[in-house]
Amino acid sequence: MVNIETKQITLKNSKFVRFVIAGVLATLAFNAVMYTDIAITGVPLDIAALMGELTVGESEFTQSIGHIIHLVNGIGLALLFGYVALPISKRIKTLPILVYGMIFGVIEVIIAVWFGMLPLLGAGIAGLNIAPEVPLMTLVRHIVFGLVLGLVISWRKR
């Protein structure tokens, strides 16, 4: 007879699950900051609406699809951070994971957003063609994303 041992996958024993949960929570935190900074500045830089519009155009599902795409993007970034950036960072210097998360957020916004996405969309480097507030808005959003990412990933170790 063959014994098959089953193992329950939980937040505590699965890096993958922990990284996915971290990506979801970090994206939700990003969204909270996004809608707060939109309300404060009046600059309509809603990434979910933009992603939805670029994907399906104007429809009743634009916002929902945009949020799903943004959530999947956040999960993908969490997996990149957890499996690639974090192991590399730990070899360089030992800092709290939440610090690595915030550094990841800064690097991500500079490379992918300021010099990638925004110029490709015609918004200029760092989105300065939209409004002077855009660089700070996007920087704060991504630092919060990285902070929450680091907090959730390091939570298991406590």
Regions found by a protein language model. Give the residues of each.
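Juxtamembrane/disordered regions of integral membrane proteins
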Residues: 2-158
